């Protein structure tokens, strides 16, 4: 497909819309945008690195705006005062052997989830080859439906925050990423909600965590496949980044309860569509 000026403009608009959904709900950018670009006649070798690059930049911008508008509180300065008295804090203290742990809770969450996502992204190369695609998609779809129902069922309950549950969902998201290459965003978002994180905070944390994972995926793609079509990557990046202030503002205005319900519905819908795709294939 020839990338004319009108086409490039239309692609930028698509990226704006898809990233608005993603940075508002914590999921949907690659899931929606990649099939649309392929339907336009673009080759997968053009689309995949361009989407990863644009989502990396948009994730950074989204994290900045979510922090700026108060949806999250990121402080990535080194935490030098971590108490180890509580069992959950011991889990965090063990991460201290890495030489760095950020200060604020939201920054710690991004650190853990981003690290798990990186492990999963690298493991994807080795795990996905031996498992049938229908099995992978059926597993992811079923899990998302179950998590969506759980989030919906607990929407009126005040869940206490649990580092143990967060670690569990972090490693589960890494496993899913390694298994199928997908399911990271919705699982990380729903896992945070079920770990006692507020919905606004969960979206902001997911947005920045995905940026880290996309950067690793982009660099791995460059190392194994070669170059990037910047005529596609740049308009995608511009459109996606431009949507992030509006997304953060929307999250701020929606409030916790409405946003949690929207997240549950989005996770359920994504899981149902995935299962329907498996059933019809």
Model-predicted segments: where are they?
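Juxtamembrane transmembrane-helix boundary motif
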Residues: 1-24, 30-46, 63-179, 189-194, ...
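Residue-level micro-sites within transmembrane alpha helices that shape
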Residues: 18-21, 54, 176, 209, ...
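Transmembrane helix-bundle signature of multi-pass membrane transporters/permeases
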Residues: 48-56, 203-211, 241, 267
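Transmembrane alpha-helices of multi-pass small-molecule transport proteins
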Residues: 50-68
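Core segments of transmembrane alpha-helices
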Residues: 117-120, 210-215
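Functional transmembrane core segments of multi-pass inner-membrane proteins
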Residues: 193, 197-204
């Amino acid at each position: 497909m020839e990338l004319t000026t009108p086409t490039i403009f239309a692609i930028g608009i698509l990226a704006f819309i898809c990233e608005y959904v993603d940075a508002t709900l914590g999921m949907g950018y690659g899931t929606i945008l990649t099939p649309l670009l392929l339907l336009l006649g673009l080759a997968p070798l053009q689309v995949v690195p361009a989407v990863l690059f644009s989502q990396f930049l948009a994730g950074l911008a989204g994290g900045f705006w979510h922090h700026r508008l108060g949806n999250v509180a990121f402080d990535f300065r080194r935490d030098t005062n971590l108490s180890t008295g509580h069992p959950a804090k011991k889990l965090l203290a063990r991460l201290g052997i890495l030489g760095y742990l950020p200060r604020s809770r939201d920054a710690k969450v991004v650190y853990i989830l981003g690290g798990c996502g990186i492990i999963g992204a690298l493991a994807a190369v080795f795990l996905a080859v031996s498992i049938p695609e229908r099995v992978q998609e059926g597993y992811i779809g079923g899990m998302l439906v179950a998590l969506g129902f759980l989030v919906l069922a607990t929407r009126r309950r005040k869940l206490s925050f649990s580092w143990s549950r967060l670690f569990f969902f972090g490693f589960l998201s890494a496993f899913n990423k390694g298994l199928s290459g997908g399911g990271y965003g919705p699982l990380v978002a729903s896992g945070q909600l079920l770990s006692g994180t507020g919905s606004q905070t969960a979206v902001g944390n997911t947005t920045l965590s995905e940026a880290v994972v996309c950067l690793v995926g982009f660099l791995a793609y460059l190392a194994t496949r070669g170059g990037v079509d910047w005529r596609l990557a740049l308009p995608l990046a511009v459109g996606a980044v431009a949507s992030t202030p509006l997304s953060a503002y929307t999250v701020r205005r929606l409030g916790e309860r409405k946003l949690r319900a929207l997240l549950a519905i989005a996770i359920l819908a994504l899981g149902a569509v995935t299962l329907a795709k498996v059933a019809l294939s």
